[in-house]
Amino acid sequence: MDARIFQDNDDTSLPVNQASVTRIHKKPGKAEAEAAVRTLLLWVGEDPDREGLLETPKRVAKAYQELFGGYSGSPEEVLGTTFEEVAGYDDMVLVKDISFFSHCEHHMVPIIGKAHVAYLPEGRVVGLSKIARVVDIFARRLQTQESITAQIADSIQRILKPRGVAVMIEAEHMCMAMRSIRKQGSSTITTTFTGDFKEKADQQVRFMTLIRT
């Protein structure tokens, strides 16, 4: 049976009311976050009281709630609803070209790229948008690309229990493009395989081939 391929170009914004991850430190309030932004403006040499920056602390705090919305996301909730009546389909399900953004945990500057995610169902499949939502849950945090890749694969494997999961991420890191060596246009590729994708080379080849199709 031929594998099904799906291309995702839709906006997959996360709901903001999902279960929070465990935090070691008490979460500061909105006023404290805005005060921190004001401090940074002063530190870089700006005047936070000039007209163009008066609302900036509020805007930045609000933007960060969206940009880092992954901390309030739960892959268990997203992948909790599955479909078992899939007419016996048990071949690869691949959702490719899932656009995402993240932020480097070292410098807090953007990582921009796309993810390709495949799994081999074991009697259960999920709605295609759910895969993209899982990508966003882990991407919208302070991250490394290696961690995002592994976390996506691990959550799908752990929750859906398929015969295998394959994840490839291609991304450009602004910490390389905007600072230090300043190499614009360079990309980083990371992969994680579980189950049949890890144990069977032909499944990896199929995955890679379908991504490039």
UniProtKB/Swiss-Prot annotation:
HAMAP family, alphabetized: FolE (MF_00223)
Gene Ontology MF annotations:
GTP binding; GTP cyclohydrolase I activity; zinc ion binding
Which species? Brucella ovis (strain ATCC 25840 / 63/290 / NCTC 10512)
Q: What is the lineage of its organism?
A: Bacteria, Pseudomonadati, Pseudomonadota, Alphaproteobacteria, Hyphomicrobiales
Q: Does the keyword Hydrolase apply?
A: yes
Top-level taxon in the UniProt lineage: Bacteria
One Gene Ontology CC term in the entry: cytoplasm
Which terms are listed as keywords in the entry? GTP-binding, Hydrolase, Metal-binding, Nucleotide-binding, One-carbon metabolism, Zinc
Which pathway is it part of? Cofactor biosynthesis; 7,8-dihydroneopterin triphosphate biosynthesis; 7,8-dihydroneopterin triphosphate from GTP: step 1/1
Q: What protein name does the entry list?
A: GTP cyclohydrolase 1
Q: Which residues bind Zn(2+)?
A: 104, 107, 175
What gene is this protein translated from? folE
**Reaction(s) this enzyme catalyzes, per UniProt:** GTP + H2O = 7,8-dihydroneopterin 3'-triphosphate + formate + H(+)
Q: Name the EC number(s).
A: 3.5.4.16
Q: Which family does it belong to?
A: Belongs to the GTP cyclohydrolase I family.
Q: Name one GO biological process term.
A: one-carbon metabolic process
Self-association state and partner proteins as the record states: Toroid-shaped homodecamer, composed of two pentamers of five dimers.
